[in-house]
Amino acid sequence: AEVYAGFLAHADHNIGRLLDYLEESGQRENTMIVVVSDNGASGEGGPDGSVNENKMFNGIPDDIQENLAMLDELGGTKTYNHYPNGWAMAFNTPFKMWKRYEFNGGTADPCIISWPSATAGHGEIRHQYHHAVDIVPTILDTLGVEPPETIKGHVQSRFDGVSMRYSVDDPSAPSARKTQFYSMLGSRGIWHDGWKAITTHPTLSGWSDFNDDTWELYHTDVDRAELHDLAAEHPEKVRELVNLWFAEAGANEAFPLDDRSPLEIFTTPRPQLAPPRDRYTYFPDTAEVPEAQAVNVRNRSFTIGALVDIPGVDASGVLFAQGALFGGHALYVKDNRLHYVNNFVGMAEQKIDGTQDLPAGENLILSASFAKDGEDPPHVSTGILSLYHGDKKVGEGRIKTQPGQFMFAGEGLCVGRDSGEAVTDDYPNGSPHRFTGGTIKR
């Protein structure tokens, strides 16, 4: 919790720097600033917290002893930390539960709007009900801009939001938003004219029956904390709101409902511009390729090959890298030998070292080939990783590969360097450890 408080102080300081610049440049008075959180405090840290949230995305439970051993590293480069869900509950007080639930603990957020030259009141609170989708309509309304119905001949989707501008001008005006629909990982909610119906789907259980979920009812105009479930007293109101939820879900294309685990969600192929294929070619000196668009080597055999020219014994650096400290793999040259590392969810660096010096020459193929021969839960492929100079095997070892994404965001695929955080601590000077002493062709 202290780490997150420290980061918030850091964010506050840098927002202040932006405000100072706007003030100094004479733009502050006529600039609308909107500051909003993205959801309630998050409960993904589980009961014991986590020093490596990537475990959760890969279906691997945390170990409290490992967490305690890393206590002094929290907030540093060696951790991908998350607070325990008890802190999430505390952060959301007086609201209950946390992110991914439809209670106010998961959905109610602060929203600060500042526009000195256009608002008479300063530091005032507004109580109208609004949603994040209302921000863009508010800006357009403020600018007097009507969104186009078509762009370059393509019909645009409708805006779901309504402008909040009226609430800035009139604190006592009734809420312009009358209905708000919620759905996340199978849990559902609907707010309408001061009443809210909520049903909690068993968390990340996968494939449980939605018909078994029980709807609760709260009169949020007088019970913002949602403490008093009135479903038994007003069954007709529950039916009304549930029917409205289904209507809104249809209008918002929310079906089918999805209660898969994070690992299931992240390992299910999604539509992409380039269709999947058996062979991918990448080149050096290009931007990193995001993981969602790069070759997918999860839960399968694969080969990584680099076509290189090596004139002498000075070649060194990364040939290929994907991912980072909390999951990834890399093929690289060190001490004139070929090496491969597979960093399993940040838990273990599995290193395979070449046993022979690199040959010199042109159009050499240096490769690492993984042959899957087994699988451990949850979808962890096991097998033999072999290193080659051309057709000559120069090293091998048994590894296991990561079941889900290497990284939730960032740290894509690179050729000739390792961008961001290094996949391994075996690089002499850390990342990017660019390849030198030779030429990578592809």
Feature roles, as predicted:
Residues 1, 75-78, 92-96, 115-124, ...:
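Flexible glycine/proline-enriched surface loops and loop-helix/loop-strand junctions
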Residues 1-31, 41-43, 47-88, 368-370:
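A long, amphipathic alpha-helix that forms part
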Residues 19, 31, 43-57, 122-123, ...:
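Short, solvent-exposed loop/turn and secondary-structure capping segments
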Residues 27-33, 175-177, 192-195, 236-237:
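Loop/turn elements at helix/coil->beta-strand transitions in domains of secreted/extracellular proteins
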Residues 40-48, 170-177, 392-397:
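Secretory-pathway/luminal and periplasmic proteins that interact with or process carbohydrate-rich
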Residues 58-94, 286-289, 411-431:
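Surface-exposed acidic, glycine/proline-enriched linker/cap segments
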Residues 77-107, 118-128, 133-220:
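C-terminal cap/loop subdomain of S1 sulfatases and analogous C-terminal strand-loop tails that border
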